[in-house]
């Protein structure tokens, strides 16, 4: 059974009387048709003023078969007015207000232009929101991310040139550890710069499953640890990412691979003794 929605298509076989616009309806269009088997029926499309259940729709037009609208607004209206099977009509009631077509790409383009939030598409594009709410939220998040990243500016410090030089030479074993005990050395600003200029993966740490799920095979991985995280650093996930193979068990178990990953850690502390081989860490003092 369909969830409560605004837009409904319907078929009513062997109708006995014409239909009219109910107070709960915003728009109604239908016509009398004859199917291939010769059956006479109403074919129509309804836009409700608010979300309505299937049971609620059947109370409005008893005996009708209802389906949640699958295509676009314009397609549903056109299907209810097609000429090839028409006997009488079509009849329209209420106001048909063309809105953005219910296609995700067009909704995304509209969101990009207007800056609307995903929830604002519930009324205008009810079916797109029903099907793709999470996709729209993700897309809006990407727009916000791009806007934020474009505004990031970097005030260069001497130590940053040392990291730049290291990144010029690929090394499949090292972990670059940028250590600045005082704070205010520009570690986070430089991490943002690498996100902006090199599409780096950024994390402040956490559980292996969460980090593995979020990592999308970026070649440059950044861990920017707050001072308060010193006792909770997940050294294992740092090493797994550097090795270019990590298991993501969140939602769906999958092993992710990469032929090369560069890892940079930004911290106010040095790594705990014994967590890495000494020859694996390359320190840069901020």
UniProtKB/Swiss-Prot annotation:
Belongs to the nanoviridea/circoviridae replication-associated protein family. GO terms for biological process: DNA replication. A motif (RCR-1) lies at residues 9-12. It catalyses: ATP + H2O = ADP + phosphate + H(+). Its EC number is 2.7.7.-, 3.1.21.-, 3.6.1.-. The active site is at 79 (for dna cleavage activity). A motif (RCR-2) lies at residues 41-43. There are 3 rolling circle replication (RCR) motifs. RCR-2 is probably involved in metal coordination. RCR-3 is required for phosphodiester bond cleavage for initiation of RCR. The genome of nanoviruses is composed of six to eight segments. In addition, some isolates contain subviral DNAs. It comes from Faba bean necrotic yellows virus (isolate Syrian SV292-88). Its main location: host cell. It is found in: Host nucleus. ATP binds at residues 186-188. One of its GO terms (molecular function) is ATP hydrolysis activity. InterPro entries: CRESS_DNA_REP, Helicase_SF3_ssDNA/RNA_vir. Divalent metal cations, possibly Mg(2+) or Mn(2+). Keywords: ATP-binding, Covalent protein-DNA linkage, DNA replication, DNA-binding, Endonuclease, Helicase, Host nucleus, Hydrolase, Metal-binding, Multifunctional enzyme, Nuclease, Nucleotide-binding, Nucleotidyltransferase, Transferase. A motif (Nuclear localization signal) lies at residues 50-70, 96-102. Gene3D superfamilies: 3.40.1310.20. Its cofactor is Mg(2+); Mn(2+). Residues 2-96 form the CRESS-DNA virus Rep endonuclease domain. A divalent metal cation binds at residues 33, 41, 84. Pfam families: RNA_helicase (PF00910), Viral_Rep (PF02407). A motif (RCR-3) lies at residues 79-82. This is Master replication protein.
């Amino acid at each position: 059974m369909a969830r409560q929605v605004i837009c409904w298509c319907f078929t009513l076989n062997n109708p006995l009387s014409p239909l009219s616009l109910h107070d709960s309806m915003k728009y109604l269009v239908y016509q009398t048709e004859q199917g291939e088997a010769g059956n006479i029926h109403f074919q129509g499309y309804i836009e409700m003023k608010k979300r309505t259940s299937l049971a609620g729709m059947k109370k409005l037009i008893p005996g009708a078969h209802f389906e949640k609208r699958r295509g676009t607004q314009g397609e549903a209206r056109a299907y209810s007015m097609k000429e090839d099977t028409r006997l009488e009509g079509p009849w329209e009631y209420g106001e048909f207000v063309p809105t953005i077509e219910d296609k995700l790409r067009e909704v995304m383009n509209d969101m990009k232009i207007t800056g609307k939030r995903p929830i604002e598409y519930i009324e205008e594009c009810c079916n797109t929101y029903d099907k793709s709410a999470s996709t729209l939220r993700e897309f809006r998040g990407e727009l916000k991310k791009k806007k934020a990243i474009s505004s990031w500016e970097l005030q260069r410090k001497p130590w940053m040139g040392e990291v730049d030089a290291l990144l010029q030479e690929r090394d499949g074993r090292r972990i670059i550890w940028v250590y600045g005990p005082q704070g205010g050395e520009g570690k986070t600003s430089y991490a943002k710069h690498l996100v902006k200029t090199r599409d780096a993966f950024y994390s402040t740490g956490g559980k292996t499953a969460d980090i593995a799920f979020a990592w999308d095979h970026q070649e440059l991985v950044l861990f920017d640890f707050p001072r308060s995280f010193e006792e909770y650093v997940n050294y294992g996930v740092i090493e797994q990412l550097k090795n270019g193979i990590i298991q993501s068990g969140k939602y769906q178990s999958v092993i992710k691979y990469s032929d090369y990953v560069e890892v940079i850690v930004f911290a106010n502390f040095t790594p705990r003794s014994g967590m890495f081989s000494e020859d694996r860490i390359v320190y840069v003092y901020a």
